[in-house]
């Protein structure tokens, strides 16, 4: 296994980093700030260990149907189209933000799920291997099964997805504490 480092994310850490994140992404969209904050703080901790390159899992949800909203597309038989659309628009939706937030700390992200050959292969996998049905709460089935078959613990391989900004508590800190008293638009001037 890989060594795991755990850091508590506090209100003061989020507050102290907010201006840097908003300036890095150049927007005051709360969801983008929350996601950007997770990348920013993770890359900051990585940089503190003098590491310059990190691996990101970006692309897995778009390739293998990981987002909950894909269940509607599955029901309407439009999942393949939506996955392809999301892949085509991924740079402006996710990658640009993540790159800006990680590079603000001097850390370059590598994106193995966006390898050209893997993308071409994954986009041609039938949707039934990605989402098992319209009520599939886990999604990304082929990816989870592969991870488990390669030796990843079942509890980890089949753990329900939780967006980083929610799992870290950053979204809650931003909404309930930090942004109550701050006009983020000021950081964009």
Language model segments and positions:
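ATP-dependent adenylate-handling active sites, centered on carboxylate activation for C-N bond formation
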Residues: 1-150, 165-179
